[in-house]
């Protein structure tokens, strides 16, 4: 940990609260924008950090995690920072080995394949001991931000984390994890409950460390039917939101259940979240109709638009903003994360277009 004083009571005053206002549904001078995976391999300065250090070492070294979190903010006028980490630090905290294979992604040498394997999972988890490095990174980053923009913390959702633990990697047919739900419903709920408890404790720890908003990533929820989502995703997502809100009602919570568009109405009525993220598979106008004014929406530009040059990006951004129907209760983002191959000019054009076009819409 740096010698720098990171006393949590001495955080600098926030200068740009546009993102937090949009989360709460308050009036804003323009639509705020941040981008999932805004710190990442598309940035040459990130590659230079990674040249000497493996992925999880960056996550586990607060000084490095802070450095890469701030990199995109030094390039683009983003309205929020998101701490550099990974959703798979939660399984690691539960004693499950996770490796990050260059060019391939996460790999679990010993996945949870049988109900007997559940006995290998460490539970309960002391999050301060196992994930304290994330908390240290948050506190350091919050101080080094100097109040420029709010700092977002995050976790993976229980179903998505369970999927990785059982499959052993991403990009599969999900046959192992989905069949678990059918073959072992009781054990599935047990595993999901364990993951949920760790996620809640982890998120509460992140708030204590300095996170000013939180996002829950359910990246694989789109693999489930509406009925299976209602049984194995929704209750745990709602539990996380409600338990965190019971302690910290002032902290905005964002839920991004990727591709589970059918769940938007239920999630918006749950009272567990302030913001729902959407991807590009739903028209913003349809999403807005489903959630009414109960929550704010976040999204939803197709990341592939960022390959296409300034004019296409601007045109598509305008279509997106117009489809949302109002600049209130809106946070601009992509429908998923940045790609490693994205040109730097892509996010630069997108952020500029969101700010300029939304100001024009508001000032009409």
Swiss-Prot record:
The keyword Cell division does not apply. InterPro entries: UROD/MetE-like_sf, Uroporphyrinogen_deCO2ase_HemE, Uroporphyrinogen_deCOase. Keywords: Cytoplasm, Decarboxylase, Heme biosynthesis, Lyase, Porphyrin biosynthesis. Pathway: Porphyrin-containing compound metabolism; protoporphyrin-IX biosynthesis; coproporphyrinogen-III from 5-aminolevulinate: step 4/4. One of its GO terms (biological process) is heme biosynthetic process. Pfam families: URO-D. The record marks 86 as: Transition state stabilizer. It is found in: Cytoplasm. Homodimer. Catalyzes the decarboxylation of four acetate groups of uroporphyrinogen-III to yield coproporphyrinogen-III. This is Uroporphyrinogen decarboxylase. It comes from Dictyostelium discoideum. The lineage of its organism: Eukaryota, Amoebozoa, Evosea, Eumycetozoa, Dictyostelia.
